UniProtKB/Swiss-Prot annotation:
Keywords for the protein's UniProt record, in alphabetical order: Cell membrane, Cell projection, G-protein coupled receptor, Glycoprotein, Membrane, Receptor, Transducer, Transmembrane, Transmembrane helix
Cytoplasmic topological domain: 43-57, 125-141, 211-243, 304-350
Membrane spanning residue stretches: 22-42, 58-78, 104-124, 142-162, 190-210, 244-264, 283-303
Protein name, entry field: Serpentine receptor class beta-12
GO BP term (any one): sensory perception of chemical stimulus
Gene symbol of the encoding locus: srb-12
Record organism: Caenorhabditis elegans
GO molecular function term, any single one: G protein-coupled receptor activity
Glycosylation positions in this chain: N5, N97, N277
Protein's job: G-protein coupled receptor. Plays a role in the navigational capacity of sperm and promotes the targeting of sperm derived from males to the fertilization site in the uterus of hermaphrodites.
Length: 350
């Protein structure tokens, strides 16, 4: 029987039991299963304890909670792909129930796309923090929650525009395969997301460059600049470097996924010598689930490194020299301050 004449049940059978497809489904399930406790541990040990401003901390907590929820839904959907074939009694049982597909597909997309857009909110918040460096430590946590709501609203609008008229009335074999009627719009959406992430990454680099210029300028090196402002500038630098690392890592994995899936759809079935192989390649979804686990290790390493540099910077900032001409001046100033305080205390007692 030619592939063009395959029924949906026969197609589901040949796709589901394809060795490469099964290995890919198991990999996505396995890394998602590992990612869930790893993300919880990372959030408890690191993210919830970050010394960053409340606005950025709220954004980062939201980002990693979204990543955890995405790993959870991927663990369920790909676990379904891998384990259900061992228990079915007919080929048609491999077809996913339309209602189950609708909710599984949409929930997976929501928690996949929100973390895609959230790094843009990191950049907006960081630019605001840099602009208000002299007073940002006193700003209450409001911008972060507002940006999260804006991101959710924008993401919901995009997805509604893509799936608003989708009936989900076709047989479905895989939770991540976009219905044919919505595929073109979804492809355009992925391109927009890729452009957005590249632009956001460039903005992060510009932010750090501006910060470096300001930090080296005489305005922030004067002695009359308060220690709190210097600390705030240092905090902006450290937190911006961390968000840059998160943004770049997400861009790397997401860019690989988007480039691969769009290339597969562009070359079509003929390149893969048949519709079955073509569908197998479309159903392979490893890059983004792998990111959910890898970001934990990168996050731990990045924060430990930044904290080490931060502690060294703080120690070098508050250290008082005790040798040479500067050490002698510091000693004289300390003695003078001590006797001035003693004189003031004795005078007040008289």
């Amino acid at each position: 029987m030619s592939e063009a004449n395959l029924t949906e049940c026969e197609l589901a059978y040949q796709l589901t039991y394809h060795p490469f497809y099964m290995i890919a489904q198991f990999w996505s399930f396995f890394v998602s299963l590992l990612a869930m406790p790893s993300l919880i541990f990372f959030m408890v040990e690191k993210v919830f304890k970050l010394p960053f401003h409340g606005n950025l901390k709220f954004l980062l907590v939201s980002y990693f909670i979204g990543t955890f929820l995405f790993a959870s839904i991927i663990c369920f959907t790909f676990g379904y792909h891998f384990f259900v074939p061992f228990f079915v009694t007919s080929n048609c049982d491999l077809i996913i129930n339309a209602t189950l597909f609708k909710y599984g597909h949409m929930i997976a997309l929501i928690f996949m796309t929100i973390p895609m857009i959230l790094p843009t909110a990191f950049t907006v918040e960081r630019f605001v923090a840099l602009k208000m460096a002299h007073s940002y430590e006193h700003v209450r946590t409001l911008l972060g929650p507002v940006l999260v709501l804006v991101v959710i609203a924008i993401d919901s609008m995009f997805l509604y525009d893509i799936y608003g008229q989708e009936k989900f009335d076709k047989p479905f074999i895989n939770f991540i395969l976009v219905p044919a009627t919505s595929a073109l719009q979804f492809n355009s959406f992925l391109w927009y997301m890729l452009y957005l992430k590249i632009t956001n990454f460039i903005c992060n680099l510009i932010l750090l460059f501006i910060h470096k210029i300001l930090h080296q300028s005489s305005r922030y090196r004067r002695k009359n600049v308060s220690l709190s402002v210097k600390y705030e500038m240092q905090e902006i630098s450290q937190s911006s470097r961390f968000t840059l690392i998160v943004t770049f890592t997400h861009l790397l994995f997401f860019g690989w996924y988007v480039s691969t899936i769009l290339l597969i759809r562009t070359v079509g079935p003929d390149f893969f010598r048949g519709f079955i192989n073509y569908t197998v390649m479309r159903g392979v979804y490893c890059a983004t689930p792998t990111y959910n686990l890898v970001i934990v290790f990168i996050g731990f390493k990045a924060l430990n490194h930044l904290n080490f540099k931060r502690n060294n910077k703080v120690q070098s900032t508050i250290q008082i020299k005790s040798t040479g001409q500067e050490g002698a001046e510091n000693y004289d100033n300390a003695i003078s301050n001590y006797w001035d305080s003693v004189y003031t205390m004795n005078k007040s007692k008289l």
